[in-house]
Structure formats: structure tokens, C-alpha cells
């Protein structure tokens, strides 16, 4: 497909790389010539220097022939304006990143009035992910499928779980747990395991289950399942605001540490039930005096990655609470993974994943399209949910006779209200939603999981 992308920052660069690698014709518009030259040299994309809200620039980029238009500049208003002009000049799907909380209640209205196909708010998505983690603190990462009914959950295996030396096929009978282990990260390698795979202490284990069955499994392996009752949040920006709203609605006591007095006033007016502490979050004595040692969750959400890392390491030293760290830059995720920072949340990854998911869904509207996409375990594994629209070589065949591609696991079938971890005798039917975990990148259709 032909894709026009406005904004060559971190998110724009990640999108340009991913979409070009998947074979799309990508044109990037940005006002920074040096940035575009770097993009064009690094990836198979074309760069155009100019303003994305200029009809002349859009025409030069080929907006009339574009299938998808994406605006991810640093300005919400510019993104919306670019999409509006793109819709007027062409006949494409338009996607805008909009981050300001003041627009949060008007997104549906904006979509209808401008004709935008999708609006992405990465800060709101990040807050929702953190909220899930604080409701299920034993997990280090949680992704949701089937409209929230199915969870993909990651945790670190320690001696306390007593699973060292246990084969995966033993888990259902040994622990009376109906879960499916989908991926394991061990010593830097990622494995899509079979039933004979033996777990070891230190493994990063990702499994799939309904919320109720995940809860029961965590109880049996002695991992925390009780939602946190109080949280200390350092950083009162958009994510801190959205997160506090969600936590307060769930009766969690919230303390926000924010250094900007004006922002503190805004937070105090908007979140009267939260305790707003106007102080520098890097003041260690202050954090300790405000009960860091007894807090059940510590969330570092400042705008500076290095500060968030140091704050979390300090909190880890003084608290046994759930730790969550926000990271903006995508380049150092492999290094951060070795620091044991608790749960790490990347808002920019969420934006990329959503847009790639949307683009893949457009490509296969007839057969089976991608409904949900997550890239997990340092971007090395894709977890996808497909909606099956018509019969294919993947349907009507017992799974035991379906020859899946190497390092691909069919994890779950949802059929109406039924959620099933499939066995060899099960079949995929038209109308099903199917969840797949794979080391393969770029799958667009359910048929892609079957060997030719």
C-alpha cells in the first residue's frame, strides 16, 4: 500500500522502519531536512521536506494515490489539520496521534467531523496498561485480546513459584490450571515452547488465559494477585492524570508528586480526591517522608527517562511495592531489560503497534484480518488476533493436521461467548477470533501461519 507519514520523530522513524520492512511504499514528510536524509539512508522510504498541512506538499507526496495517511508530529492540532487536508485532497484512511487530555472527551466528535479513521492517544493507552498492572501486580506485562476477555501475561520465574524443572505439559494437572505458556525468554533467547519444554528459575514466562484463570494460576504459584490499594506517582503529566482518574475510580488512594506549581494547581482542581504533593520527585528524603517504604505501588512518569530509571531503582531499594517505569526512548530497551525496573511502559511502542495493526487489517478485509497486534519480548515476538471472515486452508481442519510454520503457536479460539485454549481435535471456523504467537514478523492473514 502507499502510505504518507507526517512527522519523522521517534514514532515516525519506528513506523517508517516497520511499514517499509513490510513492503509498503512509504513517503515521510517533515520540516527537518537532516532527519529525512537519515531516514532515507536508513530505510527504504522517500522523504519530502515541507509542512504536512500544505496541500502543495501533500500533492508532492502523492496524497491522491495514498491508501493510508498518518500524522504523528508533536502537535495535536497540526496532526488533526494534516488529516483534514489529506481527506480533502485524497481518498485515504487517515490516522492522527492526539495526546492532550483536553480532547479526550471529544475524540468521537472530532473523528466524525473531520472524517478521521482512527485517533490514537498513547498516554491514555499507557495509563490503561499501568492500571491493569496495578490490579494484577504479580505480572510484569499484560496485553489484552478478545475485547479484554483474554490476557497475555508475562512474569519472572523465581524459586518461590516452585516451577523449576517442571515441563509445560505438567502444568494443567500439577497446578489444576487451564493456561497456555506461549513464549519463554531465557539468557537472551526467545523460545516458542512445546509441551516438553522444561521451565527454569530466571525464565521470563509469557502465558495466555482468561482473567479468572490467570488469577487462579498466580495464586497457586504464590504471585501477588490482590490489586494495590495505594499508589505514589511521580510526574503529573498526561499519563499521570489519566492513570489517577482510573485508580480513583477503583478506590485506590493516589499521591502525585509534581514539581511544577501551576501543574499542581491544575491537578488539584481536576483530581480533588488525589493528594497532590508539589515537590521535586528526585528529592529522596521527601519521598521517604511521604511513605515510599509503605506504598503498594510506585510509578515513575516524569518526562526524563534517566530520572525515571533512577527513581525506580531508589524505590526498589526502599519499597516492596509494585514498580512501574515509563520510558520514552526506544533505543535502549535491551539495556533497560537487565536493570530489573519492574514493569516498563513504552507509550511510543503502543502508537506504533496500533498503527501497524490498523494497516495490516486494511490489507486483508476479505479473508481474515488482524484485529489486535502486540509486539512483545523486546519486539522479537508478535502476538496477533485474527478475525476469520471466510473459509481457507486454515479452517475446517483439525489442529493436529494443521501444519503450522516453525515457531508459531495457535493459542486461543474465541467463538461467541466461548473462550477455548485449543487442543488437537479442535477446528477453526468462519466467525472465530484466533490468537497466534509467533517469531515470524509481518503476518497479515491467518492463512500465513500454515506451511505452504
Predicted ranges, named:
Residues 1-452:
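Cytosolic regulatory regions of ion transport systems
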Amino acid at each position: 500500500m502507499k502510505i504518507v507519514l507526517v512527522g519523522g520523530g521517534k514514532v515516525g522513524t519506528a513506523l517508517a522502519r516497520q511499514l517499509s520492512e513490510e513492503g509498503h511504499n512509504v513517503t515521510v514528510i517533515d520540516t527537518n531536512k537532516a532527519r529525512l536524509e537519515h531516514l532515507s539512508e536508513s530505510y527504504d522510504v522517500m522523504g519530502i521536506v515541507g509542512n504536512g498541512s500544505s496541500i502543495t506538499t501533500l500533492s508532492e507526496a502523492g496524497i491522491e494515490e495514498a491508501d493510508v495517511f498518518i500524522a504523528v508530529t508533536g502537535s495535536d492540532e497540526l496532526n488533526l489539520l494534516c488529516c483534514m487536508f489529506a481527506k480533502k485532497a485524497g481518498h485515504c484512511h487517515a490516522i492522527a496521534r492526539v495526546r492532550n487530555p483536553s480532547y479526550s472527551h471529544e475524540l468521537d466528535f472530532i473523528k466524525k467531523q473531520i472524517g478521521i479513521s482512527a485517533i490514537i492517544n498513547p498516554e491514555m493507552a499507557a495509563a490503561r496498561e499501568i492500571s491493569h498492572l496495578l490490579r494484577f501486580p504479580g505480572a510484569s506485562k499484560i496485553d489484552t485480546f478478545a475485547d479484554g476477555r483474554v490476557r497475555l501475561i508475562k512474569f519472572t520465574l523465581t524459586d518461590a513459584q516452585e516451577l523449576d524443572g517442571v515441563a509445560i505439559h505438567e502444568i494443567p494437572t500439577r497446578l489444576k490450571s487451564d493456561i497456555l505458556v506461549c513464549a519463554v525468554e531465557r539468557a537472551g533467547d526467545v523460545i516458542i515452547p512445546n509441551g516438553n519444554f522444561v521451565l527454569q528459575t530466571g525464565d521470563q514466562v509469557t502465558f495466555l488465559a482468561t482473567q479468572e484463570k490467570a488469577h487462579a494460576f498466580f495464586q497457586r504459584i504464590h504471585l501477588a494477585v490482590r490489586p494495590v490499594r495505594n499508589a505514589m506517582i511521580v510526574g503529573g503529566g498526561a499519563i499521570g492524570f489519566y492513570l489517577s482518574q482510573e485508580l480513583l475510580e477503583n478506590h485506590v488512594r493516589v499521591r502525585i508528586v509534581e514539581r511544577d506549581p501551576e501543574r499542581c494547581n491544575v491537578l488539584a482542581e481536576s483530581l480533588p480526591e488525589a493528594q497532590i504533593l508539589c515537590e521535586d520527585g528526585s528529592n529522596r528524603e521527601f519521598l521517604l517522608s511521604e511513605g515510599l517504604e509503605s506504598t503498594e505501588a510506585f510509578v515513575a512518569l516524569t518526562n526524563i527517562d534517566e530520572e525515571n530509571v533512577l527513581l525506580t531503582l531508589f524505590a526498589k531499594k526502599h519499597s516492596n511495592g509494585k514498580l512501574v517505569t515509563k520510558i520514552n526512548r526506544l533505543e535502549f530497551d535491551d539495556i533497560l531489560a537487565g536493570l530489573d525496573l519492574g514493569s516498563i511502559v513504552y507509550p511510543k511502542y503502543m502508537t506504533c503497534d496500533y498503527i501497524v495493526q490498523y494497516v495490516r487489517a486494511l490489507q486483508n478485509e476479505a479473508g481474515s484480518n488482524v484485529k489486535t497486534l502486540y509486539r512483545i519480548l523486546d519486539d522479537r515476538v508478535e502476538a496477533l488476533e485474527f478475525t476469520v471472515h471466510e473459509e481457507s486452508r486454515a479452517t475446517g481442519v483439525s489442529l493436529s493436521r494443521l501444519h503450522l510454520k516453525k515457531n508459531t503457536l495457535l493459542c486461543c479460539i474465541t467463538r461467541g461467548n466461548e473462550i477455548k485454549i485449543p487442543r488437537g481435535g479442535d477446528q477453526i471456523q468462519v466467525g472465530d477470533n484466533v490468537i497466534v504467537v509467533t517469531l515470524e514478523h509481518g503476518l497479515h492473514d491467518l492463512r500465513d501461519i500454515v506451511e505452504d
